[in-house]
Amino acid sequence: MSSYLFTSESVSEGHPDKIADQISDAVLDAILAQDKRARVACETMVKTGVAIVAGEVTTSAWIDLEALTRKVILDIGYNSSDVGFDGETCGVLNLIGKQSPDINQGVDRKNPEQQGAGDQGLMFGYATNETDSYMPAAIHLSHRLVEQQAKIRKKKNSALSWLRPDAKSQVTLRYEDGVATAIDAVVLSTHHDPGVKQKDLIEAVREEILKPVLPAKWLHKGTKFHINPTGKFVIGGPVGDCGLTGRKIIVDTYGGWARHGGGAFSGKDPSKVDRSAAYAARYVAKNVVAAGLADRCEVQVSYAIGVAEPTSISVTTFGTGKIADELIEKLIRKHFDLRPFGIIQMLDLIHPMYQQTASYGHFGRKPKDFTYTDGTGAQHSATSFSWEKTDRAEALRAAAKLK
């Protein structure tokens, strides 16, 4: 019997890097709501008293970037100098310019289906049947812990009103013969008001954050809990650390369980395959697993800038495939259009739905229908997290001729 430990971590919406991600995606959403043909590459940096928003944008839309940035910061919970960062009074510096026409000529085409990739690169998608979300269990639980911290913090008349926005989680699982069997260790560090006793904080976090999230069947006498292990976390957020867009790419994806091509997601419109192709690869892998073709599946795609067709598609099922990996690859090529325009159409990506992806993971979330108003006042309907649908699983299973 093989036995090993595996660890993943997550961070809350109030973590400095996640503040930056959310601002970048809020800018993207505001532009896409007005201009579906926009090209956006938005980067943000936050530090004590200032948010710097930079990047390259080509659009006919106009947005109030300063007001938008302040709203994101305030909605997260940074609304007072006592907390260390205040969306009302912080400086907002706009350094956004235009996208290079050299990139535009490689991406835009008279025939939309021949739209080229916005850059070269390689992207991975992954899925596993060890959780209902088809995500590795360690990252799934890590996300839910910091999500619960935010939920309790924002709850009206919360008994834990002393919680502040910044938080981190980490979960270590024990695996026996490739199956998760127990939680070996949990780390939860949460930003808090001064004067909170460590004993009271530990008890409250156990009852209100850990207990509702962690599966009782995986907890045992030997499970180690590290709650604010330094004993104090009063200085947090952008005062404690500088935050940058795109610096939590493992948190955003599979917690280290699957490989990563290196490209970040937030602030990038769907013409950037760093984002759209990673979403498509997840969609493909999840449908392969949901179809029962494998227990685990990792899909890699790669692109050349200005070229529509992927330069490669490869599949590995880690020995769990019910048919050969080569046959799964052929099915993928037949059932999924992985050209940039094909991905955008397949997943219906040109909608303002990205800010909600910028915290608690881009994957393993439930698709959600929503409506929004564009720049002309017209109403539109869309589905966020469309890459989490398993609507092609049945066709894949039938094509594979599995009983």
Curated annotation (Swiss-Prot):
Binds 2 divalent ions per subunit. Binds 1 potassium ion per subunit. It is found in: Cytoplasm. K(+) binds at residue 43. The gene is metK. Catalyzes the formation of S-adenosylmethionine (AdoMet) from methionine and ATP. The overall synthetic reaction is composed of two sequential steps, AdoMet formation and the subsequent tripolyphosphate hydrolysis which occurs prior to release of AdoMet from the enzyme. Keywords: ATP-binding, Cytoplasm, Magnesium, Metal-binding, Nucleotide-binding, One-carbon metabolism, Potassium, Transferase. It comes from Xanthomonas campestris pv. campestris (strain ATCC 33913 / DSM 3586 / NCPPB 528 / LMG 568 / P 25). NCBIfam families: metK. ATP binds at residues 15, 166-168, 232-233, 241, 247-248, 264, 268. This is S-adenosylmethionine synthase.
